[in-house]
A protein has these predicted regions:
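Extreme N-terminal starter segment of soluble prokaryotic enzymes
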Residues: 2-7
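Short, hinge-like loop/turn segments at secondary-structure boundaries
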Residues: 64-66, 103-107
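Short, glycine-rich nucleotide/cofactor-binding loops
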Residues: 8-24, 57-66
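Low-complexity intrinsically disordered segments
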Residues: 94, 108-132
Length: 137
């Protein structure tokens, strides 16, 4: 029984490129590989938003209206629905003058039990040290 831990670090602003959506899509799809794993093997995914990447977590995004795209907000909620660990760097939120009230914190309307965790960068660093594969977007 082995667990492969994946870490996704999102550090770029939303909608300027596909990086953020790729990170979230890969994290979500990592949960569907169980059909290819041996019994008892697992793949887990942690996602951390740091630097400019915390702007991806803003509430009430109007991506469909402005760009004709699904919002990053809905992708984050899908991650929570799949019980993925989603973290946002507290120091970077503070840098932008944002708080938990400004960002997506849950996906209750989807039936998700998980919530976004606002954490110090030291906790994100620990996650980066603990994963088997670390991907930057």
């Amino acid at each position: 029984m082995a667990t492969t831990k994946l870490g996704f670090i999102v550090q770029r602003t939303p909608y300027k490129s596909e990086n953020t959506k790729l990170a979230l899509t890969h994290a979500i799809s990592s949960q569907s590989v169980e059909v290819y794993l041996n019994d008892g093997d697992l793949v887990t995914a942690d996602i951390a938003f740091v630097g400019d990447g915390v702007l991806n977590c803003l509430k009430n995004q109007k991506a469909m209206e402005k760009y004709g795209l699904t919002s990053t907000e809905s992708h984050i909620k899908n991650c929570l629905l799949l019980d993925l660990n989603v973290m946002v760097c507290k120091e970077d939120l503070d840098k932008f003058g944002l708080s938990e009230n400004d960002i997506v914190m849950d996906a209750e309307e989807f039936g998700a039990d998980m919530t976004v965790k606002v954490v110090p960068f030291s906790e994100i660093t620990k996650m980066m040290e603990d994963v088997n594969h670390l991907l930057f977007f």
